[in-house]
Amino acid sequence: MSLTNEQIIEAIGQKTVLEVVELIKAMEETFGVTAAVAAAGPAAAAAVVEEQTEFNVMLTEAGEKKVNVIKAVRELTGLGLKEAKAVVDGAPAMVLEAVAKEAADKAKAALEEAGAKVELK
């Protein structure tokens, strides 16, 4: 029985962010490919000069109030307790990827208020 693309997308949509990351790593190893975008020539450098519109929220350190940071990660990402704890314990770790500046700033503020050290990339 062969799965349709829609069934595959639906199944992936039901996974947590960490489960999707693990799936991507497994696919990279199985098929010998990477999910990285190939670098373009000089045109890519010109695009970098433009204002950045999407940001990644990187948790660099959990700080003293780890429980509060786990709660903040859960609220921001919708992850379960176990997954959020894994993100916090695995610091430095990506909390949110490719979000708008406003959302990234709010996430950074919430995490810093909880006691974490955060970087926007």
Swiss-Prot record:
User: What are the protein's UniProt keywords?
Assistant: Ribonucleoprotein, Ribosomal protein
- Record has Coiled coil as a keyword: no
Do you know which InterPro entries this protein is assigned to? Ribosomal_bL12, Ribosomal_bL12_C, Ribosomal_bL12_C/ClpS-like, Ribosomal_bL12_oligo, Ribosomal_bL12_oligo_N_sf
Q: Alphabetically, which GO biological process terms does the record hold?
A: translation
- Gene Ontology MF term list: mRNA binding; structural constituent of ribosome
One GO cellular component term:
cytosolic large ribosomal subunit
Q: What does this protein do?
A: Forms part of the ribosomal stalk which helps the ribosome interact with GTP-bound translation factors. Is thus essential for accurate translation.
Query: Quaternary arrangement and interactors, per the entry?
Result: Homodimer. Part of the ribosomal stalk of the 50S ribosomal subunit. Forms a multimeric L10(L12)X complex, where L10 forms an elongated spine to which 2 to 4 L12 dimers bind in a sequential fashion. Binds GTP-bound translation factors.
| Protein family | Belongs to the bacterial ribosomal protein bL12 family.
Stored NCBIfam families: L12 (TIGR00855)
Q: This protein is called what?
A: Large ribosomal subunit protein bL12
| Provenance organism | Pseudomonas fluorescens (strain ATCC BAA-477 / NRRL B-23932 / Pf-5)
Organism phylogeny: Bacteria, Pseudomonadati, Pseudomonadota, Gammaproteobacteria, Pseudomonadales
Instruction: Provide the gene name from the record.
Output: rplL
